[in-house]
Amino acid sequence: MKGSAMSQQKEEFVLNVAACDACGETPRKYFVHSVKAVPDWNTIPVAPLDCCAWGGSYRVYGQAQLVLLRDVGFMCRLQCEEQAPVARYQTYFSPVYQDSCMEFFCAFDQNSEKYLNVEMNAKGTCLCEIGTNRHDRVDASENGTVPPVKVEPFAQRTSWSLLLTIPFVTLTRLFGVTQETFVPGYQFRGNFYKCGDASTATHYTMWNPVRTPTPDFHQPSFFGTFVMQ
């Protein structure tokens, strides 16, 4: 996280949050690479979480990366720099969004309104749901089995990251899609978020801006676009 690319992204982030409108109105696109093995993440495009909303002066730099790992599923890497991240919850389906939390929302089937939300704190504690809107959500786990989350320990409590794997078998169960669905040019939608509803400093940042008057990440109309390469 401390490389020159991270520093450059962080400088751009400071400029963007100063105005908050720098993200623009057009949904952003992220081009998803298909790889044979766990990649060198320095070679994978970064989605900066540089749009902020709903007030407050505290800002956290975050970024996300997404790849299709052949014969396995999708891997999502989430990183942030944050002073003293809060991680109180330790059991599945706890309200981890109240901790220092990073989130991945995604509608993998371009022909369905259903989307998956995976929310994780700095300990890797996970909340995973599926549905068509905020009020239509059900537990997305299978008998308590959730997508594996690897926590990359934060150094001196100033940065932390997560590596989430969503297997194809899970996507087939939830969306009816398979590995063969994700051919080059296939498009689907989603967003990346960083929040801390009840942390020491409440904050909300995201990849694609959510333009609602009050905090609400369950807004698929504001999702960005993922394009398979």
Which residue ranges define each predicted feature?
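Structural preference for beta-rich elements and adjacent junctions enriched in aromatics
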Residues: 2-229
